[in-house]
Amino acid sequence: MRATAILRDLLASALENQGIAWPVKTTIEPPRDKAHGDLATNVAMMASKAAKKPPRELAESLRQALAADPRLASVEVAGPGFLNVAFTPAFWQETVCDVAKAGDGYGLLDIGQGVKIQVEFVSANPTGPLHIGHGRGAAVGDSLARVLRAAGFTVETEYYINDAGRQMRILGMSILYRYKELIGEPVTEPEDYYRGEYVIPLAQDMIDAHGRKLLEMPEAEATDICRLHGEREILAGIKKDLEDFRVHHDVWFPESTLLAAGAVDAAFNELRDKKLAYDQDGAFWFASTAFGDDKDRVLVKSGGELTYFASDIAYHADKFRRGFDVVVDIWGADHHGYVPRMKACVSALGRDPEASLKVILVQLVNLLKGGEQIAMSTRAGKFETLADVVKEVGADSARFMFLSRKSDSHLDFDLDAVKEKSMDNPVYYVQYAHARVRSLFAKAQERGQAVAETSPELLALLTTDEDLELLKLLEQYPDTVAAAARTFSPHLVSFYLRDLAGRLHRYYTVNPVLTAGSDDLASARLRLLDAVAQTIKNGLDLLGVSAPDKM
C-alpha cells in the first residue's frame, strides 16, 4: 500500500545516509495492536549488524530521521528495536482524492512491467457440457487474468482442446451407440461410454444428416464421423457457456495441431539429444527421475499410443517458444500428482520451473440444494451443468461464490442460500454496499442537497475512528491487487471486498450521512462513501461481477 511504500522509502533513505543497505529480511506490516500505530517494522534489528549498533540505538536514529516528515503523526521505538509508525489523518484523507482522481483506474499498478504470462484454464475435454467444477476453474482463471492485467502484466488466456485422445474416441462411440439405438438396431450397451442425455440429440443429428448410411460404413469410419460432429457441437456449447459466464479465452488451442505440426516428435528429439529420454521394453520413456520425480514416465506406450504426458511436454515447449515468461496451468485438484512430472518437464526444456511454471489446483465443489448434496459424475451423466447453475443463480452469484475461498480448499455451494437477498449471502452483502452508496446520492439529489466537491479542506472533517478505519482500508486496495497478482490468488480480492463492505455497512448504521449535522460534514461523508463504492466496483470488476446501482 502507499503507506508501506512511503515508509520503506523514508527508512531506506535514512539507512543510506548512514551507509547501510536495505536489509533483505525487513518486514513492514500493521501491528497486532492498533494502539501501536499504523505500521511496525523490524528494520533496525535487521540492519543493526551492518550498522555496528545495538538495534534500539539504530532505531532511535531512524526515529529522529523520520520525525520531521509531515505525513507522520508519530514514530516510536518499542521492545528490542521495533519502530511503530502512525500517519496523520490528513494522509489517510488523501486516499479519497486518489480514488476520485483515478476512478475506474484506482488499483491499477505496474508491478508486472509487461512480463508475459499465459494463463491456461478450463481446458475440459469436449466430451460433454461444462459442469460446476469446470465453472470454479473458469472463475479462478478468468479473474486471475484480470488481476494480473490490473497489476501491469501482459496476459494471454488459453483453452487447450483435448481433441486427439481416447476420450474423444469414446465420445464418438457413445454417439454411434445412441444412433443405432434410436434407429432401432439391436445393440449391446458398451462398458465404457458417456451416458448423459446430451448425447441423444447428437445421435439424432446423425440420423437427420445420414439416415441409415452410418450402418453401411466400417465401424471406425462411422465412429469418426460421430466424434467430429460431437466435438464441434459440444465445443460450441462450451464456448457459449463460458461467454454467458463472462469468461474469455484469447486462444483456443487444439491438441491435434501439435501432432500435425510435428511438435511432439520435435519435443522427443530434444529430450533424446539431452539424454533425457530412452527406449525400454518397447516403450519410450522420459527420465523424469533426473529432476526429482519418483519414477520415470512413459511417453509412448509399447503399442505406439501417446500418453497425455507426451502431448503436455510438446504443448509446454510450444508455450515457451511463443515467448511467455511464465505459464500458469489451472488444474483440478485430482491432478496434484501430475505437478512433479510437469516441473521435471519444464526443467528438461531448459527453464526454471519455480520461475516459469505456476500450477494452481482447484478443489472440488460440493453443490447443495434443499440442504442435500447433489451427486455428480460426468461419465454417468449425473452432474449439474455450469449453464444450469448460471441460469438458476446468475453469473454474478456463481462467480463470487467460486472465488469466496482459496482455490485449493473444498467449496460448499448452496444454491438456495446464494439466491437469498440477505446479509448472510456474501454476494448480496458486497453488491448491496455499492448500491447503498448510490442510493444515498440519489436521495441527496431528490432532496436538493448539494454535495461539495472533494477537497483536502472538506475531507479534514473525517476524523472519527470509523472515518479513519474506512480510509485506511480503502488505502489497502492497491496493495490487495498487488498481493493477489504476486501470489496468483484472486480470492484475496473477494476477501478484501467482504471486509470493505462490512466496514461500510457498520459505518452506515453508526454515522448519519445525509443528516450529519452540517452540509459540509454530509458532503465529506458522501465523498468518503463514494470512494468506497468506486473501490468496490473496481474490485468486483476483477472478479467478473457486476456492481448494480439498485437492488
Swiss-Prot record:
SUPFAM superfamilies tied to this protein: Anticodon-binding domain of a subclass of class I aminoacyl-tRNA synthetases, Arginyl-tRNA synthetase (ArgRS), N-terminal 'additional' domain, Nucleotidylyl transferase
E.C. no: 6.1.1.19
Enzyme class: ligase
Domain of life per record: Bacteria
A UniProt-annotated Pfam family: Arg_tRNA_synt_N
MF GO annotations: arginine-tRNA ligase activity; ATP binding
Main localization (coarse): cytoplasm
Keywords: Aminoacyl-tRNA synthetase, ATP-binding, Cytoplasm, Ligase, Nucleotide-binding, Protein biosynthesis
Reactions performed catalytically: tRNA(Arg) + L-arginine + ATP = L-arginyl-tRNA(Arg) + AMP + diphosphate
Any GO BP annotation: arginyl-tRNA aminoacylation
A single Gene Ontology CC term: cytoplasm
'HIGH' region, short sequence motif: residues: 124-134
Subcellular location: Cytoplasm
Family matches, as HAMAP family: Arg_tRNA_synth (MF_00123)
Protein family membership: Belongs to the class-I aminoacyl-tRNA synthetase family.
Subunit details: Monomer.
Annotated protein name in UniProt: Arginine--tRNA ligase
